[in-house]
């Protein structure tokens, strides 16, 4: 597909282009976060974090679980996407440094292949943002409409204010 063809895509396709990365990264992070926050998952991860030398393990497991859960929900909704993407990049950098980096690239051998893919998606969202089909965009559009309505009445408000100033 040529660059010319990509630039001629309908606006809805351009707007929808960031949905698959947001939804895939978000759902993955939600699942990983919930796994750390469930009782049996927390206990398993506490033992694992202690083996890695991350102490105190329980607070770090809970913080990681909450971070992954919130980052996932944010990515899915397209709200606070850039901070969520940054949080994913940090968690994946730690996962690569502490767990997967020494095992090479191949994910079947415990390598960092999957973490690198998640990091690439997160980096794209960090740079590009959530796109037009997002809660952030909807809230921004709502705020822009509200501001336009406010500005439309501004001259009348000024006249009323001047009248009140004259009346004392």
Regions found by a protein language model. Name each.
Residues 1-35, 58-66, 77-168:
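Extended, low-polarity transmembrane helix blocks
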Residues 69:
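Conserved short histidine dyad/triad with adjacent acidic residue
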Residues 2, 38-56:
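Membrane-interface interhelical connector segments
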Residues 72:
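Conformational-control "hinges and anchors"
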């Amino acid at each position: 597909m040529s660059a010319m063809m990509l630039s001629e895509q309908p606006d809805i396709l351009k707007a929808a282009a960031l949905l698959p990365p947001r939804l895939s990264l978000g759902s993955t992070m939600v699942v990983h976060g919930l796994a750390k926050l469930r009782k049996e998952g927390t206990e398993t991860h506490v033992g694992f974090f202690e083996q890695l030398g991350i102490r105190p393990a329980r607070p770090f497991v809970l913080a990681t679980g909450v971070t992954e859960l919130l980052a996932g929900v944010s990515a899915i909704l397209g709200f606070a996407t850039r901070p969520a993407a940054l949080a994913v990049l940090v968690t994946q950098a730690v996962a690569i440094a502490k767990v997967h980096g020494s095992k090479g690239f191949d994910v079947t051998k415990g390598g960092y292949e999957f973490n690198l893919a998640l990091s690439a998606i997160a980096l794209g969202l960090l740079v590009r943002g959530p796109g037009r089909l997002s809660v952030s965009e909807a809230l921004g559009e709502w705020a822009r409409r509200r501001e336009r309505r406010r500005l439309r009445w501004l001259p009348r408000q000024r006249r009323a204010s001047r009248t009140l100033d004259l009346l004392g």
